[in-house]
A protein has these predicted regions:
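Generic N-terminal initiation segments characterized by hydrophobic and/or small/turn-forming residues
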Residues: 1, 6, 175-178, 319
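Helix-coil boundary and N-terminal low-complexity module in membrane systems
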Residues: 1-156, 194-200, 207-210, 214-223, ...
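Membrane-interface alpha-helices
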Residues: 97-98, 117, 168-201, 284-305
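Short, flexible loop/turn segments with low-complexity composition
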Residues: 131-132, 304, 321
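Internal active-site segments that recognize and position negatively charged phosphoryl groups
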Residues: 139-179
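Intrinsically disordered, low-complexity segments used as extracellular stalks/linkers
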Residues: 303-315
Length: 324
């Protein structure tokens, strides 16, 4: 798929036209100050990932074979008496219940898929970042704790507010969940650096965890005295604990902090696909491919870069090598 020409994109101003353009072909992210376009670009990425997946047989085979094996196992688990309708019900319950295990079972396959998709996205080739099965299990458990307990105090306080409390609690909970949908996708699409021995975006942020805190851990830095300090002490302690648990994903969170509108669009687009039962097993590889495209353009983007001046072929830090 050839990257979209910038002058062609500049002529498309409506959101639906932008969405079709961004979902139709790999395109660099808009400038940071273009918040609406950045949101639409992020929203279109899962659709772009799905388009790339179905158009390239090598990616489709890698994505579907493990899923078919997973479905076959669920069919065997659901096997039993009680008639056809009971078997169908047991099968779908087994499939839906086991779906959260797919990031663990398919972690290495997703990593290879993300690396193999890069040339199809106009990005320089990279080697996959392969985790051990133990790493995948530990990271999944920690992420589950962070996801479940991260905003529990805020949700609890919100429910105490009359009338609108439950609404605010739901908004906080869903916002936190969508945040971690993006984090998990970016983490699954991580690749090894282009140069052996070089640090990637995640390793750079992991060097000084106490000096490079994620946004949700910043309350621990509050310097308050008197009653205010006593009242906020539990929140500061909670933020510190949460920051330690989330330190592994500091690089992915930094991309969200740097490009919040892109992240918001990507989260919404991914959530819409993942909300479809059973089919979300097939959509998840598309989201990994989409995250690979996002990382290709944003992982090495400077923190203070005012505008996006990337080339329209290749990867920002490797375009010279690609053009040679």
């Amino acid at each position: 798929i050839a990257p979209l020409e910038p002058e062609t994109l500049a002529q498309r101003t409506k959101a639906d036209e932008l969405l079709r353009a961004y979902a139709g072909t790999p395109t660099p992210a808009p400038a940071r100050e273009l918040q609406g376009a950045s949101f639409v670009w992020g929203l279109a990425q899962p659709l772009l990932g799905l388009r790339v997946l179905v158009r390239h047989q090598d990616l489709l085979v890698r994505a579907t074979l493990p899923v078919l094996g997973f479905v076959a196992v669920c069919l065997l688990v659901a096997e039993g008496g009680g008639g056809f309708l009971s078997w169908i019900g047991a099968y779908y319950l087994t499939l839906i219940g086991a779906a959260p295990l797919s990031p663990i079972l398919f972690a290495r396959n997703y990593a290879r898929l993300a690396a193999e998709a890069r040339p199809h996205l106009g990005l320089a080739p990279r080697e996959p970042y392969l985790r051990t099965f133990r790493q995948s299990i530990v990271e999944a458990i920690v992420q589950l704790i962070v996801l479940g307990a991260g905003v529990a105090p805020l949700v609890g306080l919100a429910t105490l507010i009359p009338w609108v409390g439950p609404i605010w609690a739901a908004v906080i909970g869903w916002g936190w969940a969508l945040h971690w949908v993006v984090v998990e996708a970016l983490d699954s699409a991580r690749t090894l650096p282009a140069t052996p021995g070089e640090q990637d975006f995640a390793e750079r942020h992991a060097e000084f965890p106490e000096l490079d805190l994620p946004w949700f851990a910043l309350p621990q830095l509050w310097q308050l005295r008197g009653p205010a300090g006593a009242i906020t002490a539990p929140l500061r302690w909670w933020a510190k604990w949460l920051g330690r648990l989330g330190a592994h994903w500091r690089g992915e969170i930094a991309i969200i902090e740097k490009r919040p509108w892109v992240a918001a669009g990507f989260a919404l687009g991914s959530a819409l696909l993942l909300a479809i039962p059973v089919l979300n097993l097939l959509f998840r590889p598309a989201i990994v491919i989409a995250a690979s495209h996002v990382l290709g353009w944003l992982e090495d983007e400077p923190e203070g870069e005012p505008e996006h001046e990337h080339e329209h072929e290749g990867e920002p830090n490797e375009r010279a090598a690609l053009s040679a």
